[in-house]
Amino acid sequence: MSNKSVLLIAGEPSGDLLGAHLAQSLKSLEPNLKLAGMGGKRMREAGVEVFINADKLAVVGLLEILRQFRDIRHAMQTLKRYFKKTPPDLVVFIDYPGFNLHMAKQAKKAGIKVLYYVSPQIWAWRYGRIKKIKKYVDHMAVLFDFEEKLYQKENVPVSFVGHPLANAPTPSLSRNEICKQFNLDPDKPIVALFPGSREQEINKLLPMMVQAGKLIQTQIPTVQFILPLALNLALDKIRPFLSPEIKVIQNDISHVLAIAHAAVAASGTVTLEIALQQVPLVIIYKVAPLTFWLGKKLIRLSFIGLCNLVSPEPVAVELLQQDATPQAIADEVFQLLNNHNYRQSIIGKLGHLRPQLDRGNAAQNVAKVIHNLIFS
């Protein structure tokens, strides 16, 4: 019987989902393994003893972090105490690099093994963080093959586990069945809206999406809109921004993407999820002007959308800051729906993404790495 324990640390909804899948895989490998950590509803449902709720910690940008500083500091102090009083056999840090790299240092100081799941984007900006990773991380579990090569070059122990989204199950229901379930007409165009999972994203992006929707309706009166609500968001949070024609459902992205003809999405992991289902999309994002200015100074990339970053060529138009207007969004969605050649060209490019990222079940692959680290 195992008395080993693993701490899972996730600070965002995407990390919470990865943590939940990882917890399930770990339990199937080692049923008596104790799992605790920081996360959200998904991890809790997967049997993790979540003692820090991460819902308030999912922020992006300097000003936004300052506003949530008290919650972030409290989470850090709680984890430091946990490391000292109840040290686990291993800590798994999932994404969320600003917080997690700092806490990896604290875990290492306490003599705890560290695995980092989902690499910080050091290939995009602040490559110098590789020094911290070398010093404080025992093993990296990365989602992209080019990241594996990067860490191998730097002599950091690493495993390319594949991207979880590339191996996600597809809905068993037919398109007509899903449309019936959502009370949508399968013969009319459907546009999916993904305004993000953070309050700051909702406040900035959802009003634009709603206005863009009204403009699209003037060109395509039969268009239908569907918005899968992120698990960490209450309907009351978005209700003030909604218009009657937008159908809101609770976090059912796979079924939504199975019926959508196009999507409008906040930059983030969801852009890759949409792209892997070969749904043409437009990416939008807005942050505080100072945050954007700092980002432009520091980031070495031409694109911010994850689907564009991992593709040999751009697969989605990005509308950022002042370029993200209702009219610009509506114009691009109209092209994605009505310009047949353009639409087919985009779908063709999207079809090349999955083979690059699929290495089987990513959560099971990470669980095996963890098992080797704590039982070898």
Swiss-Prot record:
<dbReference type="GO" id="GO:0009245">
    <property type="term" value="P:lipid A biosynthetic process"/>
</dbReference>
<dbReference type="GO" id="GO:0016020">
    <property type="term" value="C:membrane"/>
</dbReference>
<dbReference type="GO" id="GO:0005543">
    <property type="term" value="F:phospholipid binding"/>
</dbReference>
<keyword id="KW-0443">Lipid metabolism</keyword>
<dbReference type="Pfam" id="PF02684">
    <property type="entry name" value="LpxB"/>
</dbReference>
<comment type="function">
    <text>Condensation of UDP-2,3-diacylglucosamine and 2,3-diacylglucosamine-1-phosphate to form lipid A disaccharide, a precursor of lipid A, a phosphorylated glycolipid that anchors the lipopolysaccharide to the outer membrane of the cell.</text>
</comment>
<keyword id="KW-0808">Transferase</keyword>
<comment type="similarity">
    <text>Belongs to the LpxB family.</text>
</comment>
<keyword id="KW-0444">Lipid biosynthesis</keyword>
<comment type="pathway">
    <text>Bacterial outer membrane biogenesis; LPS lipid A biosynthesis.</text>
</comment>
<dbReference type="GO" id="GO:0008915">
    <property type="term" value="F:lipid-A-disaccharide synthase activity"/>
</dbReference>
<keyword id="KW-0328">Glycosyltransferase</keyword>
<dbReference type="InterPro" id="IPR003835">
    <property type="entry name" value="Glyco_trans_19"/>
</dbReference>
<keyword id="KW-0441">Lipid A biosynthesis</keyword>
<protein>
    <recommendedName>
        <fullName>Lipid-A-disaccharide synthase</fullName>
        <ecNumber>2.4.1.182</ecNumber>
    </recommendedName>
</protein>
